[in-house]
Amino acid sequence: MGAHCTPITILLLLPMLQAAPDRGIQTACGQAGPQDRIVGGQDAPLGAWPWQVSLQYENRHICGATLINTEWVLSAAHCFPKHAELSRYRAVLGSRQLSVPEPGSLRLPLSRALGHALYSGEGSSGDIALARLGRPVTFTPQVLPACLPDAGVHFPAGTLCWVTGWGSPREGDLLPAPMTLQQLQVPLIDPLPCDALYRRRSSMREIQDDMVCAGYAEGQRDACQGDSGGPLVCQKAGLWFVAGVVSWGEGCALPNRPGVYIRVGAYLDWIGQHVPNATFGVVNITTYSLPGGGPPGPAPTALLLAAWLLRIL
């Protein structure tokens, strides 16, 4: 008489059939794989900017965002107009080409969006927002947070930083399929010289204290529509810090009209008030190798064996 498997036997066997646990690697925020970064508005290499997020409304990319921990992303207030319904937003993480989602990319709803109270319209102060993901993510090489600067992290004028996004390559154009993430190196410009450029036809101050500019006097290279809310990251001691949030500009890549960003360092207290356990400066994290940020689970062979055992009961 042959032996029979009971449900209790199967339950006892399953833990033995688990995939080897992925215990993760201890690392820090603001780290990306070694990639060649090309100056001048080019396709970003895979894995170059793992904190880049696509904010989508009704399945259409509208803004960028930056992953800052397992649950929160940083973006621009104008990406969340008052009439918009939160349930129609999705955050896409770990993706380089929006038209062809890569294995390991995530598409998550938002559970909360919070714009700063100072924001009153295009070009105003306070164009910064926080959005909470529908569930926490597990960090993988494709999905990692940028570092938030602390009070001691400063980036002087002339610092070469990078802006990334899926925005228009030129004003009025759409990024063609497969909608590959774009990257551009830009030098920082202090608010006062930048304001002087923008005030040539106006006596009113345009660049406020919570803003920073980045770009080139000759134009031709800049962030544009669709890049809004995305990260301006600068490197310090080998780590990438989110220094700015793409906010506004006059046209796209026009001479003497650099891009204008909200300076993240001006809103550290606000971020700390609304993001539980927000951490600034260098933060240690654990990165897992599993795609999609999922926890370790049964190996495929284990699932097949369990199904076979159930059939012969």
Indicate residue ranges for each PLM-predicted region.
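Active-site substrate-binding loop(s) of clan PA
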Residues: 117-120, 136-185
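Conserved H-D interstitial segment of serine endopeptidase catalytic domains
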Residues: 31-37, 73-77, 81-121, 191-193, ...
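Extracellular trypsin-like serine protease catalytic domains
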Residues: 34, 38, 52-58, 164, ...
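Conserved active-site neighborhood of the chymotrypsin/trypsin-like protease fold
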Residues: 73-77, 125-150
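A structural motif
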Residues: 53, 73-75, 129-133, 160-165, ...
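Protease-domain processing segments flanking chymotrypsin-fold serine proteases, especially trypsin-like
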Residues: 1-69, 73-74, 90, 95, ...
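Conserved, non-catalytic sequence blocks in retroelement Pol enzymes and Pol-derived host proteins
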Residues: 40-45, 119-123, 203-205
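Short, charged beta-turn/beta-strand-edge "cap" motif at the junction between a beta-strand
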Residues: 20, 79-81, 167-169
